[in-house]
Amino acid sequence: AQSMLDEAGWVVGADKIREKDGQKLNIDLLYNSDSVTEKAIAEYLQSEYQKIGISLNIHGEEEQSYRDNMKAGNFDMVFNICWGTPYDPQSSLAAMRAPVYGDYAAQLGLEDKAEIDQAITDILVSTDEQKRQDLYTFVLTRLHEDAVYIPLTYECNKAIYRSDLKGFHFTQTQYEVPL
């Protein structure tokens, strides 16, 4: 990462923060302060970015403020999760087309945002599985190439219940508990 920043003209200043054309390399990371996990990851990233000369300013906000700022695009970087099985990939992709989550704002700078949105719409209405697969490949490849999303972790759900409770199990999603 350091050599890539060097090649791009970002020089380490006296304060150990890189700068280019008089501009410091500062990035704001927004996280949900109600999430212990997000705070820990934000602090870790801040420490790691500092080692390569990037000032990562972390901002924890209570959940509603966090969500409002995500929708408005008031962030440089933000945490995001997908919904998982059985909702994805279609649910996460569908949500990218409207300003309801940070995805929409994060993608606004993409040259082919309209084409990506149309491909997502086509995925949702097509019954041709090969066409859908081709469209998924297009969308996910474009988002990967532009590094819009950087996978960091996968959080497992945990549950505690009494050992004498029989016939109880969890589904693949945290949103359903069969009774």
Predicted segments, located by residue:
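Detector for C-terminal structural segments
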Residues: 1, 37-46, 67-179
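Structural recognition of the beta-strand scaffold that forms the well-ordered cores
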Residues: 27-30, 57-60, 77-81, 150-151
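Short strand-loop junctions, especially beta-strand C-caps/beta-turns
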Residues: 30-34, 61, 126
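Short alpha-helix C-terminal cap/hinge motif
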Residues: 45-56
